[in-house]
Amino acid sequence: MLPISDILIRSISGYVFIVPVLLLYFLYLKKSGRKQSFLHITAVFVFCYYLFGILTVTGIGYTSTISFCPRISLIPFFGMISGPIETILNLVLFVPMGFFLPFLYKKYHHIKTVVLTGLLFSLSVEIVQMFDWGATDINDLIINTAGTCLGYWIYYLLSKILPNYFRKGVQSENANDIVEVFLFAFCTFIIMVTVQPWVIHSLLNIG
């Protein structure tokens, strides 16, 4: 696993490029009469940084060259017991995904929608890792999805205990919640496989 300082540098070097995209997006919503609350906008900025953090931790954007050289493991549950720390880290990595989605969006209050989104995001990570950015492992897909599910249940329990805090002012007023999430995820992937490696290797000269 990368050092914390390295993770911060790599994730921030990609994140700065989505900030203007987010600003323009929320400005567009405001102009079209769909202004979002300050709390929601702030939480979305945090959520997007978290997405960059996931891709950084999983090794995406680590090299500046792209070559298709897949290393695939399709044997489920193999190595989970022998590598418990890695398994736990993969689980914890996706817990915020399951928490953020229902926290930010009304259309993600159903566990099926949340888990499916976490599964698709994790699957996208595994596919991109085939291009010289890590190993594609079905166990990661299973554990990441389980982490998303756990995050949802944490949100669900807290929302029952503190309903006003978890619903008032943070929920999106946009009818296109699901489209918005996939837009943010798409932009994150594009930046991390194109611009971010160039910044890291050419501008910052980090190996």
Where do the PLM segments sit?
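Membrane-interface catalytic loops of GT-C/OST-like multi-pass glycosylation enzymes that act
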Residues: 134-137
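Bulky hydrophobic segments
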Residues: 1-127, 131-132, 153-207
